[in-house]
C-alpha cells in the first residue's frame, strides 16, 4: 500500500463493507444470537495493533461467505494502482498464494472457497473459537486498529480470518519500512548539521581570529612613523625557503 495511513483507511473501508454486505446478503445483524463466539484473539508478535471483535451473525453460512468475498472484491477495486501493486506479494506472504494484480480477486475467491468449505472448517462445532494471527505492526506514532467481524459460523469466520491475515501482513510490509526510513532521514539530517557546523567554524576562524603576524601588521599600519627596518623584520619573520643547495662554481 502507498502509506501507513492508507492501511488504516483500507481496513476501515473493508470492515464497513463486510458489515454492510453481511446485513444485505446474509440477513446478519448485531442483535442476532451467534452460534459461535470468539473466545480469545492472539497476535504472536504485536507491534502496536489494537483488535476489536464485532458480532454480525446469521444462520446462512454460504451467504456469509459470498458477502465477505463481495466486500473484499469491492475494496480491492477501490485501491489505487500503487496500492494494488503491493497486494500480490502480501497474498504470497500471508496465504502462500502466487498471484498477480490482474488475477488476485479470482485467486483469493478460489482460496477462500476451497479452504472455508473444507470439512475441517465446516465440521468445527466448537461454540467458542480462538483466532490466531502471526504478527501486526502499528503505523509510526499511532496504532493500527483492526476489527474482526464474527459471522457466527465457521465458514464465515474462516473468510474473515483470511482477510485479517492479509491486512496484518500489509502492516508488516509497510510500517517497518517507514520506521527504517525515518531512521535514515534522522541520520542524514545529523550528518548535514555536522557538516554545516564544521564549515561555519572554519569560516568563523578565518574571519574572527587573526594570526600574530597579521596583528603586528595591523598595529604598524595604524602608527604614523615606522622605520623601514621594522617593516622588513615583520614581513620576513619566517626564514626564506632554501631553493638549491649546490655550490656555485666561479
UniProtKB/Swiss-Prot annotation:
Intravirion topological domain residue ranges: 205-250
Membrane topology recorded in Swiss-Prot or TrEMBL: Single-pass membrane protein
Virion surface domain ranges by topology: 2-183
GO cellular component: membrane; viral envelope; virion membrane
Region described as Targeting to MV membrane: 2-12
Assembly behavior: Component of the entry fusion complex (EFC) composed of OPG053, OPG076, OPG086, OPG094, OPG095, OPG099, OPG107, OPG143, OPG104, OPG147 and OPG155. Except for OPG095 and OPG053, each of the EFC proteins is required for assembly or stability of the complex.
Membership in a protein family: Belongs to the orthopoxvirus OPG095 family.
Lipid linkage positions (N-myristoyl glycine): 2
Stated induction or repression of this protein's expression: Expressed in the late phase of the viral replicative cycle.
Species the sequence originates in: Monkeypox virus
Keywords associated with the record: Disulfide bond, Host-virus interaction, Late protein, Lipoprotein, Membrane, Myristate, Transmembrane, Transmembrane helix, Viral attachment to host cell, Viral envelope protein, Viral penetration into host cytoplasm, Virion, Virus entry into host cell
An example Gene Ontology biological process: virion attachment to host cell
Protein name, entry field: Entry-fusion complex associated protein OPG095
Lineage: Viruses, Varidnaviria, Bamfordvirae, Nucleocytoviricota, Pokkesviricetes
S-S bridge residues: 34-57, 49-136, 116-158
Xref: InterPro entries: Virion_mem_poxvirus_L1
Any matching Pfam family: L1R_F9L
Entry's transmembrane regions: 184-204
Lipoprotein recorded as keyword: yes
Main location: virion
Record note on modification: Myristoylated.
Function of the molecule: Component of the entry fusion complex (EFC), which consists of 11 proteins. During cell infection, this complex mediates entry of the virion core into the host cytoplasm by a two-step mechanism consisting of lipid mixing of the viral and cellular membranes and subsequent pore formation.
Cellular location(s): Virion membrane
Amino acid at each position: 500500500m502507498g502509506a501507513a495511513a492508507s492501511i488504516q483507511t483500507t481496513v476501515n473501508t473493508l470492515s464497513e463493507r463486510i458489515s454492510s454486505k453481511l446485513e444485505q446478503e446474509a440477513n446478519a445483524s448485531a442483535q442476532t444470537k451467534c452460534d459461535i463466539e470468539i473466545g480469545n484473539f492472539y497476535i504472536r508478535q504485536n507491534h502496536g495493533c489494537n483488535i476489536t471483535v464485532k458480532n454480525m451473525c446469521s444462520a446462512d453460512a454460504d451467504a456469509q461467505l459470498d458477502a465477505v468475498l463481495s466486500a473484499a472484491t469491492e475494496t480491492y477495486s477501490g485501491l489505487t494502482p500503487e496500492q494494488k501493486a503491493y497486494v500480490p506479494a502480501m497474498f504470497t506472504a500471508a496465504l502462500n498464494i502466487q498471484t498477480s494484480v490482474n488475477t488476485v480477486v479470482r485467486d483469493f475467491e478460489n482460496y477462500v472457497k476451497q479452504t472455508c468449505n473444507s470439512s475441517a472448517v465446516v465440521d468445527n462445532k466448537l461454540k467458542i473459537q480462538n483466532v490466531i494471527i502471526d504478527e501486526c505492526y502499528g503505523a509510526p506514532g499511532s496504532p493500527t486498529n483492526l476489527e474482526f467481524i464474527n459471522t457466527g459460523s465457521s465458514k464465515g469466520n474462516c473468510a474473515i480470518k483470511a482477510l485479517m491475515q492479509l491486512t496484518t501482513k500489509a502492516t508488516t510490509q509497510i510500517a517497518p519500512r517507514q520506521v527504517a526510513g525515518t531512521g535514515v532521514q534522522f541520520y542524514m539530517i545529523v550528518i548535514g548539521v555536522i557538516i554545516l557546523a564544521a564549515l561555519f567554524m572554519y569560516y568563523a576562524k578565518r574571519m574572527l581570529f587573526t594570526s600574530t603576524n597579521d596583528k603586528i601588521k595591523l598595529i604598524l599600519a595604524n602608527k604614523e612613523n615606522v622605520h623601514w627596518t621594522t617593516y622588513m623584520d615583520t614581513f620576513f619573520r619566517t626564514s626564506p625557503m632554501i631553493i638549491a643547495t649546490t655550490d656555485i662554481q666561479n
